[in-house]
């Protein structure tokens, strides 16, 4: 069953961190400047690092030329991060909902990209939000522009309004694009979206902004990311992936010096330019063997930016810049700011295309270890509690598959597939290598009889259907004896009036579509 946000509690390790901070009498900076949680300090403000520096305050931190990768640290059960001040009070999470999602169309026809269903029970937005909550970051904004109704509804139902406890300091809130006298245009890019809401973000008494994408699949401890940012005294820290030469041409690459400081950027380089972007990734924590296999580092589009630096860059230095990755971050480097790389050496997938989305979902069925696991008790993925009954399987043959809650599966075969919430699959059906997103609601027996009397089709998969290498969006009505197998091996096709698209050879049936009985696709 998907984890509910109501179950989120402080871990013993986080309490230990708090106790250590309270008992630490050797800190260079007094608690009056950095903490406002104690009752006798109520009303004190968290001072930006730049302000403290200007007052002559020295930070007792060690600058290290090596940034240890999350793979080497966060995978250890004994590793512990003690941020001071802690992330819940000093970091604001900003999740970018993305653009129109044209490459994910038709899945984004009626929903924002972060609202696309994932892994039977979840939505894409649950990934960055859960990573934040598991990293003790409870102040989270989600910026959206397109089709945000279902995303808004999901977030309001999934994440309680009082996540910060009795002080009510935590929240997950959607900020939709809006027009104003100061900003008459819609969001023009990632940086512009953040700029248009700077007036709101700067009201929060924090040290850093954590900028995240809403369409990535990965599990990351952001506290270690933020700790590296502070330890290296960085203005900006960029999460980076190690890359081999084959994949590197599809990403924005970075070059670093011996301290892990970013000195050069290249967007999807080829040939000699690609070879020039090779770096010694042992600097970031890879062993010699992995470093030879992965001589490039690519930006993940995830940033920690100090608050005063963000305000300065977006308002003063680059008031017309629209994008973080191609304009603001390289611009900060050119200004001489300290822009650090932080290596993330775990599973990460950009869910930007139908093929990537399909592979990411089917990857959770992989044996013996899935590409991404929803079963990690130390860092669960939260979502909306739906209170559905257990799935019912009647004489069904199910292998290497993931089945969501509330499904009714009758005398059929399902292999290497993901079956979403409330899916109804009738007798004789064969489902292979496919993703079924399920339904938003159940139809009553009376509804189904009425549809049958009218010659229409109920929600779900009809009798004796064969579905292979396909995505069936929510509330689709697939009649009896339908074959969705891409019999002609078509790679690209737009058949919206017929209820489906084909992209990269994957048939995608549109949400609420009707595929009549006997149709062969």
From Swiss-Prot:
Protein's recorded name: Glucose-1-phosphate adenylyltransferase small subunit, chloroplastic/amyloplastic
Listed PROSITE patterns: ADP_GLC_PYROPHOSPH_1, ADP_GLC_PYROPHOSPH_2, ADP_GLC_PYROPHOSPH_3
GO molecular function terms attached to this record: ATP binding; glucose-1-phosphate adenylyltransferase activity
Family membership noted in the UniProt record: Belongs to the bacterial/plant glucose-1-phosphate adenylyltransferase family.
Organism (species): Solanum tuberosum
GO biological process per UniProt: glycogen biosynthetic process; starch biosynthetic process
Tissues where the protein occurs: Leaves and tubers.
Keyword Metal-binding carried by entry: no
Regulation: Activated by 3'phosphoglycerate, inhibited by orthophosphate. Allosteric regulation.
The enzyme's E.C. designation: 2.7.7.27
Assembly and oligomerization: Heterotetramer.
Function text: This protein plays a role in synthesis of starch. It catalyzes the synthesis of the activated glycosyl donor, ADP-glucose from Glc-1-P and ATP.
